[in-house]
């Protein structure tokens, strides 16, 4: 199945030195609408917004930053086939900005007249909120060199299609705090990072979409979101400075609202390309040939939780049942002790290269291996998960290759966690993952996120046919875009230090008060 059979990305050029945009072409595809999302440190972002001190994408510093950011996740609480195609209108471009603290974000267009907002994407929270009628909001993003990008602030009074959500609405969870049923519904979301919160009232307005066909018919999708009047904590320092787009399972989330209004099926997909770019598509229910596993919906705070029943590494297979959350906002994969030990020790026993001795301060991963200077490629044992129901989930990108001072190393990009396992972005790379909230299944199918069903492996990969060794994958370091020179290890600037501190923050919702 072709995900977007005739899509292409149009580069619009620099609007100013800080930002660039990608517009979605009209294209044939599924019964869905979608937009691209991008990795903050991906090549496209670095090419457009070269920041002072930005870590090389394959450097040890890059992976330390991403792993540190992921660790903060641990506090988080944890329609029909013939539907007309719908997509964001021209102007709902995806923007990737160096200074933005979240790793994945996109532009959305809201209101009448419409304004664009650069929102962080988060499957771990539910509420979509925008900075709104606030006096202390972040109003611009600055780039090294002094250029800046002005950010819009939402105002209900400035949009003719905006209405306040009353306290008697089914989406108002704190009606007991209202003076009357007709009062504006208040919200406050507290996060687990240094007094960070968003407070305001719920509003309803138009999220601008168009039919994804030749007619390009405008579809004004009315969604409920937070008018964030007061933001505290790291929101003032640049993390999600222009709003947050919740993708969770609660009724208040945008996917839930779109499904209830009959605009899109109660399902969406996220595709992770090998270059750090990707797509998110609402209404995408996947294909008949995708592999699937049931979602474990657990109250009071449901997440995209699945059950793994078996792990295979090379020729070593272990029956081990454990739950894991599929979380698009986590860069690496975190496993509880039994699963971590099974994978890492099996991998280590089959690895052909010498173990690279490292420290926590140098690399966040425990199992790393040195590459011989004269080797153009190397083999590693294939990793495969079996999900509840029997479907196989081959992990196409379990490794990262990192140039160190003395040699290149490759690491098994998993880490140990004490509470619940998290399937992170690296284990989702090469797949279009479908979060079907109607059927309560998680589906997956190989995809390059652009041209459809091409192989998820852009790196040369062969299964070993030798009976002397277990199955293995072949990996060509030259195909990973590793710079030919070692990264500069000089001290980074103060501006870069601030950028890193923001990237480490991960929103963890405690409660809607």
Swiss-Prot record:
<dbReference type="GO" id="GO:0006508">
    <property type="term" value="P:proteolysis"/>
</dbReference>
<feature type="region of interest" description="Disordered">
    <location>
        <begin position="452"/>
        <end position="488"/>
    </location>
</feature>
<dbReference type="InterPro" id="IPR032799">
    <property type="entry name" value="TAXi_C"/>
</dbReference>
<feature type="propeptide" description="Removed in mature form">
    <location>
        <begin position="485"/>
        <end position="513"/>
    </location>
</feature>
<dbReference type="Pfam" id="PF14541">
    <property type="entry name" value="TAXi_C"/>
</dbReference>
<feature type="domain" description="Peptidase A1">
    <location>
        <begin position="104"/>
        <end position="445"/>
    </location>
</feature>
<feature type="active site">
    <location>
        <position position="122"/>
    </location>
</feature>
<dbReference type="InterPro" id="IPR033121">
    <property type="entry name" value="PEPTIDASE_A1"/>
</dbReference>
<comment type="function">
    <text>Aspartyl protease. Not able to cleave BAG6.</text>
</comment>
<feature type="lipid moiety-binding region" description="GPI-anchor amidated serine">
    <location>
        <position position="484"/>
    </location>
</feature>
<keyword id="KW-0378">Hydrolase</keyword>
<keyword id="KW-0064">Aspartyl protease</keyword>
<dbReference type="GO" id="GO:0005886">
    <property type="term" value="C:plasma membrane"/>
</dbReference>
<keyword id="KW-0732">Signal</keyword>
<dbReference type="Pfam" id="PF14543">
    <property type="entry name" value="TAXi_N"/>
</dbReference>
<feature type="signal peptide">
    <location>
        <begin position="1"/>
        <end position="21"/>
    </location>
</feature>
<dbReference type="InterPro" id="IPR021109">
    <property type="entry name" value="Peptidase_aspartic_dom_sf"/>
</dbReference>
<comment type="similarity">
    <text>Belongs to the peptidase A1 family.</text>
</comment>
<dbReference type="GO" id="GO:0004190">
    <property type="term" value="F:aspartic-type endopeptidase activity"/>
</dbReference>
<keyword id="KW-0645">Protease</keyword>
<keyword id="KW-0472">Membrane</keyword>
<protein>
    <recommendedName>
        <fullName>Aspartyl protease family protein 1</fullName>
        <ecNumber>3.4.23.-</ecNumber>
    </recommendedName>
</protein>
<dbReference type="InterPro" id="IPR001969">
    <property type="entry name" value="Aspartic_peptidase_AS"/>
</dbReference>
<keyword id="KW-0325">Glycoprotein</keyword>
<feature type="compositionally biased region" description="Low complexity">
    <location>
        <begin position="455"/>
        <end position="474"/>
    </location>
</feature>
<dbReference type="GO" id="GO:0098552">
    <property type="term" value="C:side of membrane"/>
</dbReference>
<keyword id="KW-0336">GPI-anchor</keyword>
<dbReference type="InterPro" id="IPR032861">
    <property type="entry name" value="TAXi_N"/>
</dbReference>
<keyword id="KW-0449">Lipoprotein</keyword>
<feature type="active site">
    <location>
        <position position="327"/>
    </location>
</feature>
<keyword id="KW-1003">Cell membrane</keyword>
<dbReference type="InterPro" id="IPR001461">
    <property type="entry name" value="Aspartic_peptidase_A1"/>
</dbReference>
């Amino acid at each position: 199945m072709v995900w977007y059979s005739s899509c292409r990305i149009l580069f619009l050029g620099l609007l100013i030195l800080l930002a660039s945009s990608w517009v979605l072409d009209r294209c044939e595809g599924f019964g869905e609408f979608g937009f691209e999302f991008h990795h903050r440190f991906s090549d496209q972002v670095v090419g457009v917004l070269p920041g002072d001190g930005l870590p090389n994408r394959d450097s040890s510093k890059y992976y330390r930053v991403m792993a540190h950011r992921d660790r903060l996740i641990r506090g988080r609480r944890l329609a029909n086939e013939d539907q007309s195609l719908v997509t964001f209108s021209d102007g709902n471009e995806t923007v990737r900005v160096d200074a933005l603290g979240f790793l994945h974000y996109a532009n959305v267009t809201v209101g009448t007249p419409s304004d664009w907002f650069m929102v962080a994407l988060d499957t771990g929270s539910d509420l979509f909120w925008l900075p709104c009628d606030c006096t202390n909001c972040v109003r611009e993003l600055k780039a090294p060199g002094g250029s800046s990008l002005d950010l819009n602030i939402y105002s209900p009074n400035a949009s003719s299609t905006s209405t306040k959500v009353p306290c008697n609405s089914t989406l108002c969870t704190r009606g007991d705090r209202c003076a009357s049923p007709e009062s504006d519904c208040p919200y406050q979301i507290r996060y687990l990072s240094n007094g960070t919160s968003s407070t305001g009232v719920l509003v309803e307005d138009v999220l601008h979409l168009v039919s994804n066909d030749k007619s390009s018919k405008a579809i004004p999708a009315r969604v409920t979101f937070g008018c964030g009047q007061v933001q505290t904590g790291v929101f003032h320092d640049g993390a999600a400075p222009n709003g947050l787009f919740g993708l969770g399972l609660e009724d208040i989330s945008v996917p839930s609202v779109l499904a209830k209004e009959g605009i899109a099926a109660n399902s969406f997909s996220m595709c992770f390309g090998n270059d750090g770019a990707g797509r998110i598509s609402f209404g995408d229910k996947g294909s008949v040939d995708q592999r699937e596993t049931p979602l474990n919906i657990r109250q009071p705070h449901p997440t995209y939780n699945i059950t793994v029943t078996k792990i295979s590494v090379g020729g070593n297979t272990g029956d081990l049942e454990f739950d894991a959350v599929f979380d698009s906002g986590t860069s690496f994969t975190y496993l509880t002790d039994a699963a971590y030990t099974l994978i890492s020790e099996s991998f280590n026993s089959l690895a052909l290269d010498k173990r690279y001795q490292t420290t926590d301060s140098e690399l966040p991963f425990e199992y790393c291996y040195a590459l011989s200077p004269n080797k153009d490629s190397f083999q590693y044992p294939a990793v495969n998960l079996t999900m509840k129901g029997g479907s196989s989930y081959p992990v196409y990108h379990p490794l990262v290759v990192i140039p160190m001072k003395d040699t290149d190393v490759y690491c098994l990009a998993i880490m140990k966690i004490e509470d619940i396992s998290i399937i992170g972005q690296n284990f989702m790379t090469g797949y279009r993952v479908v979060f079907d909230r109607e059927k309560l299944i998680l589906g997956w199918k190989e995809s390059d996120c652009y041209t459809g069903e091409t192989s998820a492996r852009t790196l040369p990969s062969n299964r070993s046919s030798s009976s002397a060794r277990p199955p293995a994958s072949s990996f060509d370091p030259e195909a990973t875009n590793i710079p030919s020179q070692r990264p500069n290890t000089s001290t980074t600037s103060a501006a870069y230090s601030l950028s890193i501190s923001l990237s480490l923050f991960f929103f963890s919702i405690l409660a809607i008060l």
